[in-house]
Amino acid sequence: MNKLYLAWWNLENLFDIEKSQYRDTWLQEKLKDELKGWNAEVLKRKIGQLSKIIKQMNNEQGPDLLGVCEVESRHVLKQLAASLGNQYDIIHADTNDKRGIDVAFIYNSHKITPILEETQRGPQPKVYSHVVMKRNATRDILQAELIWEGHPFIVIANHWPSRSGGELKSEPYRMMAGETLAYWMDRIQDIRPDVPAIVMGDFNDEPSNRSLTEYALSTREHSKAASKRARNPYLYNLTTPLLGAEIGTHKYQGEWGFLDQMLANRAALNNNNIHYNKGSISIVANNELIKAKNRPLNQGQPRRFNRPSSKYYDPEGYSDHLPVSIELNLPK
């Protein structure tokens, strides 16, 4: 097959059980009220709900690579991967986020292979966990390289600081994350300019916000990102064709937005490399994922799973975000 299906999904607080042996003491104390009632049965239910949707992706073949955020640990991530089938494996690095949630990848090992390095656990995917300098620790930016049919490509997962405390007050933190991303994209451009890179994440900002356009150098102009004459390594925002659609990836105060996005570097827009299949960007949205109460889907909102300690706990739910997906093609 000359097609690769990539997706991104904010899993909404996929934590390990309430009193997990894998959780640090400081985090256990911090989360004890939030995770009250989050037992093995609830975790199994949450994983089952997520797994059901993930398996439906890519015409029920499942994604070839899925970027995720709001997953607590390697331990719980491996449980999710196992629920998808034995062909799936994970790419993960612990971060110092103040709520203990990370970004990661799940990939189909029958189709793509990560670059490996030797570790205490034996050969593991080689990752670069780029720290975002912030007073209160946030998620690192996770970078990995994979091989598909002999061709390398890079994937980078983001979960930028939230809008907690207000959009404007928190904006500098996301600008900092954008600057960090741009720095590493600049290094990739300098050292490996012909390697395609797909950047994905929950940026907690819209495509038009400064953190993306001015700091991460994301653009909605395909020609600007594809140009070899551009002085800076611009990223084409693949979400561009979806802007203005009736449904986004997240709903806040009755308005759909596009906090979850995918971006591509210049090499990923070149048909001589692994490249983005133009027009393939899509939001994964259906009657299961959106709670619309017999109204049109755009009038509903993502059906949250939440947690037992919340009055909004819904064991039939999934996440407060919708997944977004793209396709990549082999060189022509």
Where are the model-predicted features located?
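Metal-dependent phosphoester-hydrolase catalytic domains
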Residues: I188-V195, D205-K332
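Extracellular/periplasmic catalytic domains that process cell-envelope and extracellular macromolecules
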Residues: M1-N2, N59-E60, L84-G85, D97-R99, ...
